[in-house]
Amino acid sequence: IHLSASEEVTFSKISAELQDLGFEISAMGGSSYAVQAVPAGLEGLNIPDLLRDMIASAQEKTTAIHDEINSTLALTMARKAAIPMGQVLSNDEMENIFNSLFSSSNPNYTPDGKNILCILKQSEIEHLLE
């Protein structure tokens, strides 16, 4: 991956957090870097784009404290690793996702804070179908 000067400055600030998350990135000289390993579950993604998004997120955070950077990086990774809407899944894949969701510590909300599920009364459903 080749980084601009501003991206390189931000990258140097977050490289330890990236390593903690499971990335292995080494300098190749100039502004070029080699990605040697990525966190489990991110294989097959466009890693240069993912890293640029993570760097951009870190650049937007002017008060970049350790926890905030980790939260931003983890959220970016979660968004990139998410199953695209409309993707067809096998029954086993759906069952695995369902079981993983309800064994998580917060099964009600996405990383962005959006509702995953909503309980409606029968009267509310009937009203929606009118």
Q: Where do the model's predicted regions map?
A:
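Long, charged low-complexity intrinsically disordered regions
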Residues: 1-130
